[in-house]
Amino acid sequence: MYNRFVLNETSYHGAGAVKAVAEEITARGFKKAFVASDPDLIKFGVSKKVTDVLDDAGIAYEMFSEIKPNPTIQNVQSGVEAFKASGADCIVAIGGGSSMDTAKAIGIIIKNPEFADVRSLEGVAPTKNKCVPIIAVPTTAGTAAEVTINYVITDAEKNRKMVCVDVHDIPVVAVVDPDMMSSMPKGLTAATGMDALTHAIEGYITKGAWAMSDMFHLKAIEIISKSLRGAVENTPEGREGMALGQYVAGMGFSNVGLGIVHSMAHPLGALYDTPHGVANAIILPTVMEYNAPATDEKYRDIAKAMGVEGTENMSVDEYRKAAVDAVRQLAKDVGIPADLKAIVKPEDVEFLAQSAYDDACRPGNPRDTSVAELAELYRSLM
């Protein structure tokens, strides 16, 4: 048995790193950039921090902003046509997971036109060619899409999210600059931060976990637990910590997969447009309780990484409870709702459960589950 580990060719970290965007484009010989960013980031001047760098370097670019939260097949199709018309030879993706996921899908289809039907990319797509080179500049500290081989596109006709896994979609360069994240409001900071914690915890206990991924996930849990409260208050230390912590979590989970927290969160985004991080944060503690019997001593490690003292002297039940309690407390401290009562309609539970069971993240869960058990988990959160 052997394991594969895929990362960016190059990554930049720290305040001011955004300057590296122009340096990389020039060094790689690209002539024109296709800049993919959502309308709000353009409206509030966040994307301008990157395009100013391009302007100063005399690099030609074309903007594409037809991107919505939980990006759709239509967004991707529009992007493919816009890219073809642009004459660009690289993509600069600015934003959170929505911008980067859209950019990945566009880049894959451009280089693998036989997959022009976006639905054909669901699951592990057998593409043959690397996507258009992507330079990814995250503006949120959560999805880690800048370092993952995953992307998620919403099929609006079927009210479902498609998880796509493709080693050919990883950005060649990640530029992780905490200054690009400083304009995030508290609610978005909290939601994306809890998404990052979910990545780290699910990645640590997933069936595919191994020594190398464990190393990244435990460190990510530690960094995020120390940094998220400060990031919500917009402290420089908190922002910098979350920028690093979410990236480290991405280094891990991208290579080993996730579990049913994400499986349950994806249908909520597709059906109700629930922010992905909020859905994960609400679901995580309950699923941790459900998964506990299948995690050996890993919850002891999680509790310790989150700052719980005395874990070495705790019983199995005690350290498992301590880990779950630490997650619940962090979510509460940053203002995450405690349940799904305001989101889920009772008549939708069976559809949600079936969608969660069919989701690509479900097989990696440490505890095998069923549609009925997933339905019960949803109900327990209502």
What residue spans do the PLM features occupy?
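Short glycine/serine/threonine-rich phosphate/pyrophosphate-binding segments
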Residues: V18-V21, K43-V46, I73-V76, S99-A103, ...
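Glycine/threonine-rich beta-strand-loop-alpha-helix active-site module
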Residues: Q74-D179
